[in-house]
Amino acid sequence: MRGNLRRPGPAGTAGPGRTGIRTSADGGRARPRTGAGTGVRAGVRSGVVGVGAGIRTGVRWKISAAIALVGALVALALSLVVHNAARVSMLDNARDLADERIQVAERMYEAGRAQSFGVKLDDPAIPRDLMMKVTQGRRATYVADGPHGVPDIWAAVPLKDGRVLSLHTRFTDRSADIMKDLDQALIIGSIAVVFGGSALGVLIGGQLSRRLRKAAAAANQVAQGERDVRVRDAIGGVVRDETDDLARAVDAMADALQQRIEAERRVTADIAHELRTPVTGLLTAAELLPPGRPTELVRDRAQAMRTLVEDVLEVARLDGASERAELQDIMLGEFVSRRVAAKDADIEVRVVHESEVTTDPRRLERVLFNLLANAARHGKPPIEVSVEGRVIRVRDHGPGFPEELLADGPRRFRTGSTDRAGHGHGLGLTIAAGQARVLGARLTFRNVRPAGAPGDVPAEGAVAVLWLPEHAPTNTGSFPMLPLSGG
């Protein structure tokens, strides 16, 4: 049997050690003692909540789970502290009561009166540890583990005639009920703390998650060319926190990148503009040369240089996001058929479904001609053009587009060919993509392979697809569109 002995001393101090002995001189009053061990352990059952794979692991749920976990740990720790403190306090009160009763019984015995409180003389059931302290001539109390975990309270005092007067009581039912009620209240309070912490975490995490989603959406708009969008304005709020700092940093980065891009665009445009005059003069001078093969070479290279300068200027204008589309209503199939026939009569045009569209004919022609030129330069005949509703497809039967172009899209001065001589400058598809953006259209590229063939099988051709918008927008990304008055 394991128990706690307490022998009241003259000053009411607790004895050292785990035995919890408290002694007192005859006639002394034992004071309540805090922190004494009772020899009883409180068992706490903890539950583990499984999180399924289907639950979204966003910021709000992570914050909610963290707050709930911390709240559960704090509630558990406080519950244990309160439970043990309450139990120790009630046991101390029971000991003090037993000590007072044994003193009264001692005085009644010495006065020759009848005993009360269930006091016994020389009770053989007195715990051995308590008996050892009593034989030292001091009064003492003792707490032992009783059946079903209910403590037994003992008090004993040595008499002048050498006998031992003892008192044995059980922890009262009322005290046990109080402990049960306390434990129940602690459990309910802990559950309330966990649920309250979870709700608070969802609220806080939801606000943070919404701001982050707004920041991500604004950043995507900036990436798509929306120069007027600011992440800081998108997330809103008046409190400056880490999200606000992140938004300001993204805005600063976007501004710095935009300034650098704008500076590079201006330099490119200025250089191309300055080259336009001497190149025009060179082309004019070449026309004055006498006929012959050298003259043809000079004229061809001068014309190529002039085309390059014009293309560079066009790319610079498209990068400046200041281009406007002059809209007209046209029959797309008829328009494509006439333009392709004027460009190359050998190219087959198939109109699957005619459709009336509102677009800029000049820019659409530029996109179409650049796609045809790319197919003729890098692909193999036959070149096929099809029109189906608002969709234009240009296909060749060459080796297909380079993987870099399929992954990253057209890039200026990158042709995908190791030998750039006679293969253009990589500006044709770049201009086509830029003009498509001005039109509010979408330009995609893919390679044609046999059905079910793996990716390492050589392509049997390349297809460029231009998807014109169903409705003519007033503002497409960073390229506004202005309709022509009078059609």
From Swiss-Prot:
UniProt GO cellular component terms: plasma membrane
Composition skew (Low complexity), residue ranges: 1-11
Keyword tags: ATP-binding, Cell membrane, Kinase, Membrane, Nucleotide-binding, Phosphoprotein, Transferase, Transmembrane, Transmembrane helix, Two-component regulatory system
PANTHER family on file: SENSOR PROTEIN CREC
Enzyme class per UniProt: transferase
Entry superkingdom: Bacteria
Protein name (database record): Sensor protein CseC
TM ranges: 63-83, 185-205
Residues where Phosphohistidine is found: 273
Keyword Nucleotide-binding attached: yes
Chain segments carrying region Disordered: 1-41
Domain Histidine kinase: 270-472
Source organism: Streptomyces avermitilis (strain ATCC 31267 / DSM 46492 / JCM 5070 / NBRC 14893 / NCIMB 12804 / NRRL 8165 / MA-4680)
Membrane topology value: Multi-pass membrane protein
GO molecular function, one term: ATP binding
Domain HAMP: from-to ranges: 206-262
Name of the coding gene: cseC
Location relative to the cell: Cell membrane
Predominant place of localization: membrane
